[in-house]
Amino acid sequence: MEHQGVRKTYRYRLDPTPEQAQVLEIVIWRCRTLYNVALEQRKLWWERGQDDGASYYQQKAELPGLKAACPEFGAIHAHVLQDVMLRLDRAFQAFFRRVNAGETPGYPRFQGRGRYNSFTFPEYGNGAVLDGRVLSLSKIGRIHIRLHRPLEGRPRPLPSAGKRMGGRCVSLARRRRCNHFLAPDKKPG
């Protein structure tokens, strides 16, 4: 039997400088703003009956134009902005899945300060790299991290930075091999 990996996520506290903390807040604020603007755009498309343009790929394709029109979004890594669009698309997919299942759907919500408090680098190594006790985030800088337990396995996507319990933290996903599996002694039932 081939060994399969197990995905495990580790959460660590960040120790940013005051300037880095301010940059992290600005990135989260801009990501939340982009999410809300994209949600408003989809809502307008839907009300006008132009639902053919309301897709992740359409909105993702508009990001370069947004960065040209609003240079402050150019200060954020492109994959982080694309992940914001993916978050919104997943919210709509869940909405339509519930509609089709006959459940109470719950239209995707506009995100306030307390509801949208993180951002994600979808690819490890492309914008986010851990080097010892320092996390390098593209266009943000090198932030010290409190490694209170060792990381196991090889890096996987989704280094996610945000705020939890009043402090800033990062979640790092890792894939590690399992050297043992429990096999059942007898057939279930």
Show where each model-derived region lies.
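Nucleic-acid substrate recognition interfaces
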Residues: 1-189
